[in-house]
């Protein structure tokens, strides 16, 4: 990643790119790492989760250059959870949004909420067919401790709905040994397809906090913004 960001490498900073972030709160813009690069559309006060996810995508690392995000000069459109999906046509037209990060689920808890391709899955698949330059990235879920019969523990635990869609990228978490993290959801989904499509480090991810500092968090919520960024 460092070589991709470096001027002597690919120099991929995210400049000129707009990323949508669907999460549970606004991004508090006094956090220096986001100054002048956030379009807030969330009607809720900031929370740790939303700020941390956003920093992984596009934090500038101004307080500490070692802690910048994957696309430190990208513009962020912040919206409440799945409203980033339903609002995507508007944000594509108004802000040229090309990718979204989605660290949430709309599914029921437990095994009844795993693996189903439903009306929500179909909706997002159709939208991505209509907007060929738009990519949606979703956290797989943290249900790796479930046993959903007839599968053994941890399998068939991808969240239903958006995460099961065929055109999105669903992201799982790796542990420090580069094996699937115990908490990370994984397929197959109900129609037999394999998910997630990709995995990344999901333990103790360091990113922005709301009080002008950095902090760690773990989970697939912290992994999908690595891929989206």
Where are the predicted features?
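A short, flexible beta-alpha/helix-coil linker loop
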Residues: 106-110, 212-213
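Subtilisin-like serine protease catalytic core
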Residues: 2-85, 94-99, 109-116, 130-135, ...
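Extracellular S/T/G-rich loop segment that most often corresponds to the catalytic His/Ser-adjacent loop
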Residues: 23, 157-229
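Glycine-rich, charge-decorated loop segments at or immediately adjacent to ligand/cofactor-binding or catalytic sites
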Residues: 142-164
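Active-site neighborhood of phospho(di)ester-bond hydrolases with catalytic His/Asp-centered motifs
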Residues: 101-103, 136-141, 171
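Amphipathic alpha-helical segments in well-structured domains
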Residues: 50, 117-121, 155, 191, ...
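Alpha-helical scaffolding within the catalytic cores
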Residues: 83-90, 153-157
């Amino acid at each position: 990643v460092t070589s991709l960001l470096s001027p002597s490498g690919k120099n991929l900073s995210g400049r000129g790119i707009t990323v949508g972030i669907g999460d549970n709160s606004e991004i508090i813009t006094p956090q220096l790492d986001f100054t002048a690069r956030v379009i807030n559309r969330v009607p809720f006060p900031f929370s740790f989760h939303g700020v941390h996810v956003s920093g992984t995508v596009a934090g500038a690392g101004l307080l500490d250059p070692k802690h910048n995000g994957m696309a430190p000069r990208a513009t962020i459109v912040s919206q409440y959870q799945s409203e980033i999906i339903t609002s995507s046509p508007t944000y594509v037209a108004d802000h040229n949004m090309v990718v979204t990060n989605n660290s949430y689920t709309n599914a029921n808890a437990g095994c009844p909420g795993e693996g189903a391709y439903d009306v929500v899955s179909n909706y997002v698949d159709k939208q991505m067919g209509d907007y060929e330059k738009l990519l949606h990235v979703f956290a797989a879920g943290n249900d790796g401790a479930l046993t959903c019969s007839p599968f053994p523990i941890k399998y068939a635990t991808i969240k239903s709905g958006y995460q099961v869609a065929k055109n999105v990228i669903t992201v799982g978490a790796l542990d420090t040994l580069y094996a699937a993290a115990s908490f990370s959801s994984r397929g197959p989904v109900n129609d037999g397809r394999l998910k997630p499509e990709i995995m990344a480090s999901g333990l103790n991810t360091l990113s922005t906090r709301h009080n002008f500092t950095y902090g760690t968090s773990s989970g697939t919520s912290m992994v999908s913004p690595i891929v989206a960024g």
